[in-house]
Every structure is written in C-alpha cells, then in structure tokens.
C-alpha cells in the first residue's frame, strides 16, 4: 500500500474529527452556561453516542497502526517538533484508550467509558441545580459594604424579580465573585464561600428541603467514578 504520511493521514483524520469536536464542544458549553430541561434532555440523549464514537476511535487498531508507522518511519526525527509531539501523544491516547485490549476486556473498557461519561454529566447537572437552589436575602445594605454599585443594583433587581425586599445574593459567578472580592464583612464572604464549596455534597446548604438536597449529593457519584477509574487503570495494566 501507499506509504502513510502526515498529509495523507493525520490532516484528513483531524479535519474529520475536529468537526465533531467543535460542534459537540459548543453543545457542551451551552449545557453548562444556558441549561434548560430541553437542552439537558438532548445532551443526555446524544452523550452516549459521542462517547461511543470516541471510545471506538481510541480502540481502532488500524488507526493506531498508521500512527505507529509514522512514528517508526526513518524520517520521523526530521519532522517539525510539533508534528512529532502530536504523533507521540496520539499513540499515548490510543494505549490509554484500550487499543491493545482483547475481548472481553475491550468491551468492559467501553462500558466503563460510557458509564463515566454519564456519571460526569450527572455530576455537572447536580452542581448546576445546587447552584440554582441557593440564595441569600440581605435586608440591610450596610451588610453589603464594599460592593460596587453595579453589583448592589444587580442584587436589588434579583430580589425584586422574585417579589422580595432587600438584596438577593446567589452562587452564580456574577453575584458570587463581587462579594468574595469586594465585600468588607468577613462573615458574609465566609457564608457565601461555604455555600459555594459544599454545593452538591453531603454538607451542602441548599436546597433547603433535605430530600431535594440529598438527591443532588455527588458523594456516591464520586465513589463510583473512583472505582471505575481504578478498574480502568487495572485493565490497562497499571
């Protein structure tokens, strides 16, 4: 067959996979910053398909052997450093993706990858929902001493939008960050910080309802992810 080269193999492959990466990256970004039930449903419907695609690419022996041929070619050392590094990293990704596994380990590896993707998405959803669930209503503007005028106005408008008096603070970045950076009251900064770092955990402060709070607890997800990663590492010989 024809000798494999950067121009005939790597560039066409990257052009094809880049299209999926870009499109899915946009969808993933939107699911993180503009989450809606509809978008979440579509994302979760397609996540297993995208995960399966990348897992199958990572276990594609023919692609792996093409990269290996590039690496073993006499002119490899003459390639530009960036191209050499790209080839080396591709080979590493293939090995970590289970390309050298045989059945049934190969199928188990794919199942682990898909389960990890689903758990990772659920983890993110729980953090988003826990972030949405928290609010702190401050009645006395003196407690917000140090906050810039625009942050104060936004907090006031946020409270009014809910039909409430005073100022509403949340764990969303436009509300949370000005408090952490500018608020003079240590107690206010601490209360918001504790709420932020314990989101979706067994020590979470929101939602107020214990059942709803427990439903967003990521502890069990973390435990399962750690176990899956340990099994994945074992399958790869680590």
Please provide the spans of the model-predicted regions.
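Zn2+-dependent metallopeptidase catalytic domains
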Residues: 1-238
């Amino acid at each position: 067959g024809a000798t494999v080269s950067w121009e005939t193999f790597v560039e066409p492959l990257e052009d094809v996979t880049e299209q999926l990466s870009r499109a899915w990256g946009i969808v993933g970004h939107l699911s993180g910053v503009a989450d809606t039930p509809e978008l979440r449903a579509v994302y979760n419907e397609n996540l297993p398909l995208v995960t399966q695609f990348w897992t199958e690419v990572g276990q594609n022996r023919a692609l792996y052997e093409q990269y290996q041929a590039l690496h073993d070619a006499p002119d490899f050392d003459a390639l530009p450093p960036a191209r050499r590094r790209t080839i080396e990293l591709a080979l590493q990704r293939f090995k970590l993706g289970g390309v050298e596994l045989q059945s049934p380990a190969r199928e188990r590896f794919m199942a682990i990858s898909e389960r990890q993707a689903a758990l990772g998405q659920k983890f993110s959803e729980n953090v988003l929902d826990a972030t949405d669930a928290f609010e702190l209503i401050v009645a006395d503007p003196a407690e917000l001493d140090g906050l810039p005028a625009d942050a104060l106005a936004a907090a006031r408008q946020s409270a009014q939008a809910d039909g409430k008096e005073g100022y509403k603070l949340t764990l969303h970045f436009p509300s949370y960050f000005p408090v952490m950076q500018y608020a003079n009251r240590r107690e206010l900064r601490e209360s918001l910080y504790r709420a932020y770092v314990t989101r979706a955990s067994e020590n979470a402060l929101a939602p107020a309802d214990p059942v709803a709070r427990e439903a967003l607890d990521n502890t069990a997800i973390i435990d399962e992810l750690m176990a899956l990663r340990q099994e994945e590492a074992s399958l790869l010989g680590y």
